[in-house]
């Protein structure tokens, strides 16, 4: 506001507002020139007058000062500013006041809502804690009542309990004595009936008593009879175990009974594992046979079901029976079982990985994830029983490896889909156009490529999201809750594909020799717009979608969205710059050939514009249409009203003196060169390969600069006759008539074409230009 208030009365008013009218134009121009010089040297009005600039801290008209006086300020405005400026100042102040008022209201409302939310939260917490305290009080009361009842019941039953216990002891002793006297007959009957377990239990119940009272004759006779019967029982059990025709539960029962009869545990342990190995190896052989080439392999879900029900189920039975039977073996027995499980488990895992490898080429993960879920779920039980064998960890590692391979597979699929989309675009661009039927436009091709890529990305995300579904048994593992989401899906798949897409797009900026073929300029333009769209919206959308679907619980660093957007923008800039160079070189090649293949010394008097200049205008117009399909117009400088009527008088200003002077001396060209060079010193430097902005005007400006600079350099290398110079004059005027409307600043076209004509004049021994009116007639006719 202070800047607006300090504006002097001369600013903001045009020539029509000055009371002096046209007489004030000259002083006005001088004031503007002085102002530009002061702006260039960084001087203010105070510094020009000889004293340092800066607002007076005691100035009552300084809006931002501590001593601001509104009455003095308004009085100064009324005295120094016209009505129009007063109204503009009022409008600006009202706008700023409203903006400040709106900001203050927004700030108050935001903080008010936060305070209300915090108050509600605290009130809710108080209510919850009050309810908890009431419930705890009721619980303490109930516990006290229960304790009181328990004490009263125990005191009432104490006397009766002692009498009942004494009678029960006498009764139990009588039953034991009766059992001992009947033991030999019971054992004999159990062996005859095949009730080996019952016989062993009878023997176990009586063994300690018989050992304790074997010095008594009656007990000694019972013990001798029992030992004979027990020896016969052990022989039958060993025969049954060694036959191996029964199942795992029956064999485990035999070992259990033999151990109960006192047989050596070490020998039984080795025999038990040997029999179990044979059965489990049969299961592995059947699984390996399913992987053979001759029969069609079952689907992966059926394969894992068979392995889980057969091998894993059998291993669980063996492990459970072994731990129950040989627990007394201690660490040595556990190590034997762990080594046994590791060996056979490793062979089973190898078969599973071979079968899973056959699924890596498929695009659907649903069946594969279900198979991995069942595989991992079935190995929970042996993993718990055989923690030392590490079966559960090995199964998890297999699942993680498969998940990584699927991510890599989907990344390659996305890359292939992107390349396929580019191939379709190239074919569409190269396809011949039928009469009366136009092919798809660049905008349609861009929309097709963008939608196709986005569709493939969403499909891949949905496919790999199955690995983190809640119903999947391994989804709660640390890898799938953290690294899989952040480093696998986000960084490896999505960020990796976006960077690969940018690298693939940048590879089209290589020279044709490196790529094996020229890239269509339209493809460069389309890719630049695609990368720019990714920078502005698509990357943020894709990463937000990924973060929402895969709730990352990993603290490892990830690529920021801003970094990816910067890479995509840089790729778009390189592609667009390369597009400008390619199109500029195409037009430059036409201009270069047209200059180098013509004999400019013996050319005839120009009657028409050369065809190559018409072709340049046509190609530039086509490029303008092509770029306009994908990029916005851009900002142009204000165009002069006579841009199409200019007839190149700049080159003649420094040469007409030498051309029409009565005495043409050898010093004249030197003077002409000197004047031309002095004029170049004060003209703006033209950067041919300046950075290209993302708009149509900037692209066309870059192409035209390259083309006209090439024309200028070619003209400097040729020698022209009088008519050759006039032909260059006609051609340049024709180009000026049409090219100025494509560039951001028409002065750029004028300067370059002026230099072309001036260079041709310098290379001409007899520089006689054509009359501007004749040039205009020829160009209008052409």
Curated annotation (Swiss-Prot):
It comes from the Eukaryota. It is found in: Golgi apparatus, trans-Golgi network; Recycling endosome. The modification Phosphoserine is found at residues 18, 44, 649. InterPro entries: Cullin_repeat-like_dom_sf, Vps51. The keyword Amino-acid biosynthesis does not apply. Keywords: Acetylation, Coiled coil, Endosome, Golgi apparatus, Lipid transport, Phosphoprotein, Protein transport, Transport. One of its GO terms (cellular component) is cytosol. The modification N-acetylalanine is found at residue 2. Residues 1-31 are annotated as: Disordered. Residues 116-148, 270-292 form a coiled coil. Its main location: Golgi. It holds the Pfam family VPS51_Exo84_N. One of its GO terms (biological process) is brain morphogenesis. Acts as a component of the GARP complex that is involved in retrograde transport from early and late endosomes to the trans-Golgi network (TGN). The GARP complex is required for the maintenance of protein retrieval from endosomes to the TGN, acid hydrolase sorting, lysosome function, endosomal cholesterol traffic and autophagy. VPS51 participates in retrograde transport of acid hydrolase receptors, likely by promoting tethering and SNARE-dependent fusion of endosome-derived carriers to the TGN. Acts as a component of the EARP complex that is involved in endocytic recycling. Belongs to the VPS51 family. Component of the Golgi-associated retrograde protein (GARP) complex, also called VFT (VPS fifty-three) complex, composed of VPS51, VPS52, VPS53 and VPS54. Component of the endosome-associated retrograde protein (EARP) complex, composed of VPS51, VPS52, VPS53 and VPS50/Syndetin. EIPR1 interacts with both EARP and GARP complexes and mediates the recruitment of the GARP complex to the trans-Golgi network. Interacts with STX6 (via N-terminus). Interacts with VPS50 and VPS54 in an EIPR1-independent manner. This is Vacuolar protein sorting-associated protein 51 homolog. It comes from Mus musculus (Mouse). The gene is Vps51.
């Amino acid at each position: 506001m202070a800047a607006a208030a300090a504006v002097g009365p001369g600013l903001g008013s045009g020539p029509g507002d000055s009371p002096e009218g046209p007489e004030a134009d000259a002083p006005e121009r001088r004031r503007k020139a002085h102002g530009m010089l002061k702006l260039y040297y960084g001087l203010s009005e105070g510094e020009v007058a000889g004293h340092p600039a800066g607002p007076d801290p005691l100035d009552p008209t300084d809006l931002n000062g501590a001593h601001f006086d509104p009455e003095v300020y308004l009085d100064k405005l009324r005295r120094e500013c016209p009505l129009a400026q007063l109204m503009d100042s009022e409008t600006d102040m009202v706008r700023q006041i409203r903006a400040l008022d709106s900001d203050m209201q927004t700030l108050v409302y935001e903080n008010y809502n936060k305070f209300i939310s915090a108050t509600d939260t605290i009130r809710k917490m108080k209510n919850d804690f009050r309810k908890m305290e009431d419930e705890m009080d009721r619980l303490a009361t109930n516990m006290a009542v229960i304790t009181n009842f328990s004490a009263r019941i125990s005191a009432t039953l104490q006397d009766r309990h002692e009498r009942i216990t004494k009678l029960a002891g006498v009764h139990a002793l009588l039953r034991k004595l009766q059992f001992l006297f009947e033991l030999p007959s019971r054992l004999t009957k159990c062996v005859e009936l095949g009730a080996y377990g019952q016989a062993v239990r009878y023997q176990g119940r009586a063994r300690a008593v018989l050992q304790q009272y074997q010095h008594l004759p009656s007990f000694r006779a019972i013990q001798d009879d029992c030992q004979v019967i027990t020896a016969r029982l052990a022989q039958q059990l060993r025969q049954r175990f060694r036959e191996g025709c029964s199942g795992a539960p029956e064999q485990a029962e035999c070992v259990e009974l033999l151990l109960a009869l006192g047989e050596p545990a070490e020998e039984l342990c080795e025999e038990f594992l040997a029999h179990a190995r044979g059965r489990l190896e049969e299961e592995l052989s059947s699984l390996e046979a399913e992987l053979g080439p001759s029969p069609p392999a079952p689907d992966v879900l059926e394969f894992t079901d068979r392995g889980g029900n057969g091998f894993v189920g059998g291993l669980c039975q063996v492990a459970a029976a072994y731990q129950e039977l040989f627990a007394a073996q201690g660490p040595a027995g556990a190590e034997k079982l762990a080594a046994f499980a590791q060996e056979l488990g490793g062979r089973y895992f190898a078969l599973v990985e071979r079968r899973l490898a056959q699924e890596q080429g498929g695009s659907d993960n649903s069946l594969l994830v279900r198979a991995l879920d069942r595989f991992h779920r079935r190995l929970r039980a042996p993993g718990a029983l055989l923690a030392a064998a590490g079966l559960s960890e090995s199964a998890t590692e297999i699942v993680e490896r498969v998940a990584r391979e699927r991510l890599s597979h989907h990344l390659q699929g996305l890359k292939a889909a992107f390349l396929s989309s580019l191939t379709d675009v190239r074919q569409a661009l190269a396809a011949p156009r039928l009469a009366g039927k136009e092919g798809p436009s660049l905008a349609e091709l861009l929309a097709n490529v963008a939608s196709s890529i986005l569709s493939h990305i969403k499909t891949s995300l949905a496919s790999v999201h199955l690995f983190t579904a809640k119903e999947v048994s391994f989804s709660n593992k640390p890898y799938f809750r953290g690294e899989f989401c952040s480093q696998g899906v986000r960084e490896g798949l999505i960020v990796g594909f976006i960077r690969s897409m940018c690298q693939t797009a940048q590879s089209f900026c290589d020279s044709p020799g490196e790529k094996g073929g020229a890239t269509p300029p339209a493809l460069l333009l389309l890719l630049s717009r695609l990368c720019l769209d990714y920078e502005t919206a698509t990357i943020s959308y894709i990463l937000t979608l990924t973060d929402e679907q895969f709730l990352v619980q990993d603290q490892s660093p990830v690529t920021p969205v801003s970094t990816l957007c910067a890479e995509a923008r840089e790729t778009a800039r390189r592609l667009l710059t390369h597009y400008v160079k390619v199109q500029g070189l195409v037009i430059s090649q036409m201009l270069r050939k047209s200059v180098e293949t013509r004999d400019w010394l013996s050319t005839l008097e120009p009657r028409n514009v050369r065809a190559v200049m018409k072709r340049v205008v046509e190609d530039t117009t086509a490029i303008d249409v092509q770029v306009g399909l994908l990029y916005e117009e851009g900002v142009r400088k204000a165009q002069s009203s006579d841009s199409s009527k200019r007839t190149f008088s700049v080159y003649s200003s420094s040469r007409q003196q030498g051309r029409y002077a009565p005495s043409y001396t050898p010093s004249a060209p030197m003077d002409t060169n000197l004047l031309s060079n002095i004029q170049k010193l004060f003209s703006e430097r033209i950067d041919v390969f300046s950075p290209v902005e993302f708009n149509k005007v900037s692209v066309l400006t870059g192409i035209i600069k390259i083309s006209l600079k090439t024309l200028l350099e070619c003209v400097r290398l040729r020698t022209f006759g009088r008519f050759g110079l006039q032909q260059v004059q006609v051609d340049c005027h024709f180009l000026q008539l049409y090219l100025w409307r494509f560039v951001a600043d028409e002065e750029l076209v004028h300067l370059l074409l002026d230099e072309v004509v001036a260079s041709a004049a310098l290379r001409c021994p007899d520089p006689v230009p054509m009359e501007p009116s004749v040039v205009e007639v020829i160009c209008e006719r052409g």
